[in-house]
Design a protein with these regions (language model features):
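ABC-type nucleotide-binding domain
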Residues: 2-22, 139, 413-666
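Extended non-transmembrane interhelical loops and adjacent amphipathic helices
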Residues: 3-5, 9-13, 22-84, 172-215, ...
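Juxtamembrane helix-loop junctions of ABC transporter transmembrane domains
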Residues: 72, 76, 102-103, 110-126, ...
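An intracellular "coupling" helix at the cytosolic face of ABC transporter transmembrane type-1 domains
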Residues: 88-92, 195-196, 212-221, 225, ...
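Transmembrane helices of ABC transporter permease
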Residues: 92, 96-109, 223-277, 348-361, ...
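Transmembrane helix-loop-helix hairpins at lipid-water interfaces of multipass membrane proteins
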Residues: 97-163, 243-248, 346, 359-363
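Hydrophobic alpha-helical transmembrane bundles that constitute the permease/transmembrane domains
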Residues: 105-113, 157-165, 217-220, 224-236, ...
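Helix-loop-helix
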Residues: 241-255, 325-398, 403-404
Length: 666
């Protein structure tokens, strides 16, 4: 097909040349001047195309860097604003929070009372043991002398454990309910976001908001927030009782605790810097290995294997050096903190023993004080790590709220107010002085007007970035226009319901997309109520039935977009079958045969002919040989239509279209 169209194009050019020669109106010098002018314009088009591609690549790289910087930021912009937002989102579970807070208070009370009461238990036991020793009698534990005290001690611990279990259960319930609420809101939000949002954000970035960020936030609420509140309550209660027991010992404990926190902060800050350096070397090694894999042919062709290996070897050596340093610092935090803790215990034991000998402290109080050391020091050590975890979770919550606060599409008219198409759709499309820009201060389309009559084939051509896809996006109302209007059979599309409007269109995209499911489900994607007979009929019309029957389970074979068993051409045939089954009034074909072999292209061509028969069709194509039979060709440049007409009319005009056409056959 391509060769025939090329020959046709060359023949058209030759016919035009013969016409000029017959008229004798143009001297040879004028012909040479025109040829030179066409060559200059052609070269300018190539250079402009290259500049547009470079500019797009630079903009994409800059946007990726901005997104990466944002993802690495684990500190919320406004902590309290995010906390208030989370509180308002969990409005239906406030009573659960109140019970959690009350449980934490009671847990802290009983958790503090247990070691304090143990002092009485030990003192009573020690007193009875001393009496028995003085009277030279056997000491037996009874309910009257110590049993009641031990039972009360056991019940205090039981109460503390019960309140801890209650708060853990309720906090998990609140976190999961909030997670479910926000996940559902994100799913609904994505359906209301304009196409501009998806153009400006990577798929992984959006998916991360609905998965990683929500999971991190939920996990931190269940563990981090609960641990923070419990730790604060435990530390406050323990230190308060420690001051009651002994002010000097408590001051010694607080001194060593402050020293421990200081060491942890200093080492953690230094570890953060070294870890960042390690991540840089990991990125370098990843890039070097990826280049060595993807550019293997070039490396071998230029005998650069040794240099490529040397780069990886050097980066690996630096990574090993930095990793050893980082691992040492990370592993040194725990022993350093434990050493300071043991030193504190030794000092407290020496001071406490002297007070015990002097009669300023009982044995029970002395052992209870050591219990409080553990009760207070462990939460204090965890507080810094818990705080960092919560900061990261709040940053995740902030990113989730940023997504939920994104501007939405303009709402559709109410069902009773929406404009309706008058009966059967004929497919007459008109752009009337349309103005549009992706940014308010940067208009792209200034005054675009054309009319597509029912059943016509409309081709849209132009260099990269000329506005071809933008025109189709406006037609489908993926974007809202800034001025003018677009009509379908005389009805303003901006006043129509988007669902009803898009139901009239069928799209065959350059990147044919298959969803996870069977082949039959993929063909019936837009028409789930279709019968198997209708699905098979659409597949036959799309020239894909024979291929489907060679699959293991035929139409019940499961496929996905990354399935390697289906070629690009076969994917496009399946999407053509999908469109045929929907039976739309208007077609949009986006370079549907740009990357297939000749045989598949012929099959797609026959399927396209069946698809376009009797329908208004918009074809976006870079290979102009495929649209020489179009009823109307729109030549776009920088968002505007600079030429329109048939193939012969535009060739005769010797303008931008002629330059594009001749450049493909020169």
């Amino acid at each position: 097909m391509t060769e025939e169209l090329k020959k046709q194009g060359i023949a058209d050019g030759a016919a035009d040349a013969e016409t000029v020669e017959e008229t004798g109106a143009t001297p040879d010098l004028d012909e040479a001047a025109k040829a030179a002018e066409r060559e200059a314009r052609r070269q300018a088009l190539y250079e402009e195309n290259e500049r547009a591609e470079d500019e797009r690549a630079r903009a994409e790289a800059e946007r990726m860097r901005d997104v990466d910087d944002e993802d690495e930021d684990e500190t919320p912009r406004d902590t309290w604003a995010t906390v208030r937002r989370l509180w308002s989102e969990a409005a239906g579970d406030h009573w659960r929070f109140y019970i959690v807070f009350a449980s934490i208070v009671f847990y802290a009370i009983f958790n503090t009372a247990a070691p304090a009461y143990s002092a009485r238990v030990i003192d009573e036991l020690w007193g009875h043991i001393q009496v028995a020793f003085a009277n030279d009698t056997t000491f037996n534990i009874t309910w009257e002398n110590c049993g009641r005290t031990i039972f009360i001690y056991f019940m205090i611990w039981t109460a503390a454990a019960s309140f801890y279990a209650l708060q853990s259960f309720l906090m998990s319930s609140v976190a999961e309910r909030l997670n479910l609420l926000l996940r559902n809101r994100i799913a609904q939000k994505l359906n209301r976001l304009p196409l501009a949002f998806f153009d400006a954000h990577r798929p992984g970035e959006v998916v991360s908001r609905a998965t990683n960020d929500l999971d991190k936030m939920s996990e931190s609420m269940q563990r981090g927030l609960l641990q923070l509140l419990v730790s604060i309550g435990t530390v406050v209660g323990a230190v308060s009782v420690m001051f009651v027991f002994s002010v000097p010992l408590t001051l010694v404990f607080l001194f060593f605790t402050a020293l421990s926190l200081l060491v942890t902060k200093v080492v953690s800050r230094r570890t953060h810097d070294v870890t960042g350096e390690r991540q840089e070397w990991v990125s370098r090694i990843t890039s070097a290995v990826e280049e060595g894999y993807s550019g293997r042919l070039v490396i071998c062709a230029f005998n650069r294997e040794r240099q490529s290996s040397a780069e990886v070897h050097q980066a690996s050596g630096e990574l090993a050096r930095v990793s050893a340093k980082a691992d040492f610092m990370i592993n040194a935090v725990g022993p350093a903190v434990r050493f300071i803790g043991r030193l504190a215990q030794i000092v407290i034991a020496i001071v406490g023993c002297s007070m015990l000998v002097a009669g300023h402290m009982t044995v029970g109080v002395f052992q209870a004080f050591f219990q409080f050391i553990y009760e207070a020091s462990e939460p204090m050590t965890q507080l810094s790590f818990t705080f960092n975890s919560l900061q990261s979770a709040l940053a995740s919550a902030e990113r989730v709220f940023d997504l939920l606060d994104e501007p939405e599409m303009e709402a559709d008219p109410q069902p009773g107010e929406a404009a309706r198409l008058p009966g059967r759709v004929e497919g007459r499309v008109a752009f009337e002085h349309v103005r549009f820009g992706y940014a308010p201060d940067k208009p792209l389309m200034r005054d675009v007007s054309f009319t597509a009559e029912p059943g016509q084939k409309i081709a849209v051509v132009g260099t990269t970035g000329a506005g071809k896809t933008t025109l189709i996006n406006l037609l489908m109302r993926f974007y809202e226009i800034d001025g003018g209007r677009i009509t379908l059979d005389g009805v303003d599309t901006s006043r129509m319901d988007r669902g009803e409007l898009r139901q009239q269109f069928g799209m065959v995209l350059q990147d044919a997309w298959l969803f996870d499911g069977t082949i039959a489900e993929n063909i019936a994607y837009g028409c789930p109520e279709a019968t198997r007979e209708e699905i098979v009929a659409a597949a036959r019309a799309a020239q894909v039935d024979f291929f489907v029957r060679t699959m293991p389970q035929g139409y019940d074979t499961r496929v996905a977009n990354d399935a390697e068993s289906i070629s690009q051409g076969q994917r496009q045939l399946l999407t053509i079958a999908r469109v045929l089954l929907n039976n739309p009034a208007i077609l949009i074909l986006d370079e549907a045969t740009s990357s297939v072999d000749t045989r598949t292209e012929l099959a797609i061509g026959r399927a396209m002919d069946a698809l376009m028969r009797g329908r208004t069709s918009f074809v976006i194509a870079h290979r102009l040989s495929t649209i020489v039979d179009a009823d109307l060709i729109l030549v776009m440049d920088h968002g505007n239509i600079i030429e329109q007409g048939t193939h012969k009319e535009l060739l005769a005009a010797e303008g931008a279209y002629a330059d594009l056409y001749l450049s493909q056959f020169a």
